[in-house]
């Protein structure tokens, strides 16, 4: 099969189109003929810096995929040849990823592709959907009626997070830049929109929320993470996707008694946590129902 192979860490030219043997399947695995693969910032970071398993090079990147089941083992119970699936699996240095004609996945970690999405749309959804879902519902303790700050609301994770928060009955303030992104997040249901290039988001959020958001979701990191501590209520939640720098000043978080959580949806893959990967597949099934009901969309 054809695959885009990462031969070393470096610039884009380390990605080379090569012929690889067709993968075999065992246990409850599916062989999926990929129709589309997602491209995310994590893919470019792994390509530039190296994968989580540098000893297993060369590697096939790509976490997200959507396609048709080409073959299934006799032990597979949920899918058969011809079924359309989507998933987030592999591509971080251990299990081969989705930058290939075929991918192998344990059927327990896959979900039926939402009928309302094209294969390209479905392949763009798993990582951002799981990330936003876990960040809000599992790390951030999201409750109906809360006021939630979501940074970079027009981004991949951000635009899904806005919709999930609104579906759960929360009010949303989000940061963006420019007219086009403002229109997008308004259309997604954001209640408060702050152009961070023209206004101080800390002051804007404190004014909108009456003293601080109940929950803040940081998808940017750095100085934004630091400043966000100043617009969360006492005993509120701050969830971040990024690792804070060594120069982070935690004083405000401590004084406000914030609960700071980290969201990395790759953890189950990194450590082989089967139950957690099955849970993520359930998130894809629940998200798929929202897509098909017209309550959630991927941009």
Q: What do these predicted ranges mean?
A:
Residues 22-38, 50-91:
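Glycine-rich beta-strand-centered segment in the early N-terminal region that forms part
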Residues 123-198:
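Mid-domain Rossmann-like dinucleotide-binding core that forms the NAD(H)/NADP(H) cofactor-binding site
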Residues 223-296:
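Glycine-rich phosphate-binding loop and adjacent beta-alpha segment
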Residues 200-210:
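Short amphipathic alpha-helix with an adjacent loop that forms part of the alpha/beta core around
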């Amino acid at each position: 099969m054809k695959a885009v192979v990462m031969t070393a860490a470096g610039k884009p030219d380390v990605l080379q189109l090569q012929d690889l043997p067709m993968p075999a399947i065992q246990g409850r695995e599916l062989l999926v003929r990929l129709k589309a693969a997602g491209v995310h910032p994590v893919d470019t970071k792994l390509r530039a810096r190296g994968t989580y398993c540098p000893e297993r090079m060369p590697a096939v990147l790509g976490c997200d995929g959507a396609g048709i089941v080409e073959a299934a083992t006799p032990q597979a119970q949920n899918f058969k040849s011809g079924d359309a699936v989507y998933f987030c699996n592999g591509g971080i240095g251990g299990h081969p990823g989705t930058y290939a004609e075929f991918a192998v996945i344990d059927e327990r970690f896959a979900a039926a592709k939402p009928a309302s999405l094209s294969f390209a749309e479905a392949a763009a959804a798993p990582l951002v959907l799981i990330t936003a879902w876990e960040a809000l519902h599992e790390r951030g303790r999201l409750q109906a009626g809360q006021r939630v700050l979501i940074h970079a609301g027009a981004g991949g994770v951000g635009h899904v997070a806005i919709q999930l928060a609104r579906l759960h009955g929360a009010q949303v303030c989000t940061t963006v830049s420019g007219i086009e992104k403002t229109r997008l997040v308004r259309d997604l249901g954001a209640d408060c929109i702050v152009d961070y290039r023209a206004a101080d988001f800390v002051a804007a959020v404190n004014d909108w929320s009456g003293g601080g958001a109940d929950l803040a979701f940081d998808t940017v990191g750095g100085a934004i993470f630091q400043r966000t501590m100043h617009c969360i209520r006492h005993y509120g939640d701050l969830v971040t996707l990024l690792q804070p720098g060594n120069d982070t000043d935690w004083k405000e978080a401590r004084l406000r008694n914030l609960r700071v959580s980290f969201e990395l949806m790759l953890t189950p893959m990194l450590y082989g946590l089967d139950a957690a990967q099955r849970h993520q597949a359930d998130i894809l099934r629940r998200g798929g129902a929202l897509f098909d009901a017209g309550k959630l969309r991927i941009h």
